[in-house]
Amino acid sequence: MAGGLPHPVLWSTLLNVDTITIGGATVEFKHVFYTWCAMAILFSLGLIVRSSLKVVPGALQNVFEVVIGGLEDFVVGNIGEDGRKVFPLLGGIFLFILFQNLLGLVPGCDAPTANVNTNAAMALFVFGYYNYQGLKRWGPGYIKHFMGPMTWLTPLMLPLEIISHCARPLSLTLRLFGNIRGEEIVMVLFFLMAPIVGTLPVYFLFLLGKVLQAFIFFMLTMVYLKGAFEHAH
C-alpha cells in the first residue's frame, strides 16, 4: 500500500530496491529510495525555476516566491537578522520534509517520513546544527544556556536542561513519524471502506496534515536556533 492508497505494488518493489544486502545483512532501503525521489523532484523544480526567472514571474516562480518569501519573513520576525543566515537551512528543511510527506499521497509511493530512521537522521542533524551555532556564537559561554538564571539553581537546572535538550531529537523523530504513519494507516482504512470519490474530501484533509507536519518540524528547528542565538541570562 502506498501513501494510504490500496495499491498492490510499490514502485520500489518493481525496481527491486525495497532491501539491499550489505556484508551479508539485509537492510531496508525503501525509505532511502523515496527520499532520493523527493530530493530529485525538489532539485529539478529548483533548476526549472532558476532557468526561467523573469521580472514578471510565471506561475511556478510565483509559488516559490510566495512560499520562500513568507517563510523568510516568518523566520526573521521570530529570530531577527540572524534568521537570514540560517534561513537557507530552515527553508530547505521545510521543503524537503514537505516533498517527502507528499510522496505518500502518490499511488505506488511511500512517504519516507513514515519511517522512523529518516526522521531520526533529520532530528539528529538539527540537534547537532543548533548546538554548533550556539557554540559558534558564544563559545564556552554557551554552557550558560543550561545553567539557569541564578547560580544557586545550577545543580538543579543543569541536569534538567541536558535531559531536555537530549530529548529533542527523540521528540522531533517520534512526532513526525507518528503523525505521518498514523495518517497513512487511517487513509488506507478510509479508501478501503468507501469509493475514492467519496473520500476525496478526507484526502485533501490529509494533504493539509502533511503540510502542517512539515511546518511544525521547521518551526521547532527555528525555535531551537533562536534559543541558541539568545544571550543566556
UniProtKB/Swiss-Prot annotation:
Bilayer topology: Multi-pass membrane protein
CDD domains per UniProt: ATP-synt_Fo_a_6
Recorded superkingdom: Bacteria
Molecular-function GO term, any one: proton-transporting ATP synthase activity, rotational mechanism
Cellular location(s): Cell inner membrane
Alphabetized Pfam families for the sequence: ATP-synt_A
Annotated InterPro entries: ATP_syn_F0_a_bact/chloroplast (IPR045082), ATP_synth_F0_asu (IPR000568), ATP_synth_F0_asu_AS (IPR023011), F0_ATP_A_sf (IPR035908)
Gene Ontology, cellular component aspect: plasma membrane; proton-transporting ATP synthase complex
UniProt main location, coarse: membrane
UniProt function note: Key component of the proton channel; it plays a direct role in the translocation of protons across the membrane.
Assembly and interaction partners: F-type ATPases have 2 components, CF(1) - the catalytic core - and CF(0) - the membrane proton channel. CF(1) has five subunits: alpha(3), beta(3), gamma(1), delta(1), epsilon(1). CF(0) has three main subunits: a(1), b(2) and c(9-12). The alpha and beta chains form an alternating ring which encloses part of the gamma chain. CF(1) is attached to CF(0) by a central stalk formed by the gamma and epsilon chains, while a peripheral stalk is formed by the delta and b chains.
Name of the protein described by the UniProt record: ATP synthase subunit a
Organism: Nitratidesulfovibrio vulgaris (strain ATCC 29579 / DSM 644 / CCUG 34227 / NCIMB 8303 / VKM B-1760 / Hildenborough)
